[in-house]
Amino acid sequence: MRGYISDNGIYTYHGIPYAKAEERFVTATEPDSWDGVLDTTEWGPISPQGAILGGSANEEDNGDNNCQNLNLWTPALDDGKRPVMVWLHGGGFSSGSANGGNTDGTNLALNQDVVVIGVNHRLNVYGYLDLTEYGEKYEHSDNAGLTDIVASLDWIKENVAAFGGDPENITVFGQSGGGAKVLSLMTSPYAEGKFQKGIVQSGATETLGVTFATKEQSLAITDKILTKLGITEANIEDIQTVSNADLQNAATEALAETGAEFEVPLAIGDGYGMEWGPVIDGDYLCIL
């Protein structure tokens, strides 16, 4: 693959595919191979952005469900076995990305002699809509966003040595929602052995507006969304082609209604409401 060298000598790669999600709400698979040289000089696609803290999603959003890509910064392409730091962005589990200036790993790689990686993954309804009652295809749909992150760790462990990193010295770290993602990985048996350390920056669950849904809550959200969209078990595959605007609008309403039903306090202000996040299913995510 072809990246570029920054002005201060850091090897930089944007949009490296670590998996692919050809369908919504389905666990991503290995990325396609490519012929020739893969250009990784431009940012890759990010997840559609969802509502957060009771707001509304952007109906003009041009995000992509197939957003499984990462950005990488390294001081050298040698066998230096540098520590690897994997950044999980904030924005709850609903918004944000690993792209852009405020997630650029150049300075950290330069000043600390580490390999820095930022991960893009599915968010909001794309990452956490619980369709597990609709067949094996949707087995981990309730935690699809987490399955993306775990897939990125698999790619990193397998390939980071080629970028001067140590696959046995991987730290996941993140702020706010990113910190909560670190906590999620710490509880998931599917992430076991894929990283060695974690840093949680203001990402405490329950007390900072980041809550994990129970199975009862996640299924209630799903029932409301499908009803609003006119989707039943008989035509469940229509969920694959519903417009992003309709899907996000239904999701925003369902989160508010389910929060009121289960009396989940809003993170900010009075009243009730829920945010997108992982589901404690006893399998992919266990009780904290």
Locate the predicted segments by residue.
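A short beta-to-alpha transition loop/helix N-cap that caps and shapes the active-site region
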Residues: 125, 180, 204-212
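A conserved short beta-strand
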Residues: 192-205
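Non-catalytic accessory segments of hydrolases
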Residues: 1-146, 167
